[in-house]
């Protein structure tokens, strides 16, 4: 399996257990993971520096993932940041809504670890650290 060594990933989720689980899965593959408990904190981090990949929950209080990705796409270089939506909603129309809002891909909760790593590799390896 390919490694995620030195890939900087921002994980955004209001559930601390989900954040910890995602961090563990990604760090186990060698990624450098930053976490944010909400979209506002994530946006603050993203305004300072863009990671190689954003993994964000969709349903969060105050600012949801759809609003977050819309604001990210307005940032300098934000239009090219790979972003994966996380949600408990598994209907096809939910997936389409995530893609229309600006996410590149979509994962349902509970997250399948192999599918998470496959998608993260797909996007991170397409944009290596020096790109």
From Swiss-Prot:
<dbReference type="GO" id="GO:0000160">
    <property type="term" value="P:phosphorelay signal transduction system"/>
</dbReference>
<protein>
    <recommendedName>
        <fullName>Uncharacterized 14.6 kDa protein in sodA1 3'region</fullName>
    </recommendedName>
</protein>
<dbReference type="InterPro" id="IPR011006">
    <property type="entry name" value="CheY-like_superfamily"/>
</dbReference>
<dbReference type="InterPro" id="IPR001789">
    <property type="entry name" value="Sig_transdc_resp-reg_receiver"/>
</dbReference>
<feature type="domain" description="Response regulatory">
    <location>
        <begin position="8"/>
        <end position="124"/>
    </location>
</feature>
<keyword id="KW-0804">Transcription</keyword>
<keyword id="KW-0597">Phosphoprotein</keyword>
<keyword id="KW-0902">Two-component regulatory system</keyword>
<dbReference type="InterPro" id="IPR050595">
    <property type="entry name" value="Bact_response_regulator"/>
</dbReference>
<keyword id="KW-0805">Transcription regulation</keyword>
<dbReference type="Pfam" id="PF00072">
    <property type="entry name" value="Response_reg"/>
</dbReference>
<feature type="modified residue" description="4-aspartylphosphate">
    <location>
        <position position="57"/>
    </location>
</feature>
């Amino acid at each position: 399996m390919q490694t995620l060594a030195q890939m900087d990933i921002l994980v955004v989720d209001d559930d601390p257990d989900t954040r910890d689980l995602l961090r563990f899965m990604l760090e186990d593959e060698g990624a450098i993971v930053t976490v944010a408990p909400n979209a506002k904190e994530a946006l603050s981090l993203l305004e300072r520096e863009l990671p190689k990949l954003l993994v964000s929950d969709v349903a969060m209080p105050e600012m949801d993932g759809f609003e977050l990705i819309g604001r990210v796409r307005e940032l300098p270089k934000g239009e090219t940041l790979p972003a994966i939506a996380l949600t408990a909603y598994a209907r096809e129309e939910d997936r389409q809504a995530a893609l229309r809002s600006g996410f590149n891909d979509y994962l349902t909760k509970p997250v399948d670890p192999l599918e998470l790593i496959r998608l993260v590799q797909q996007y991170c390896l397409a944009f290596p650290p020096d790109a």
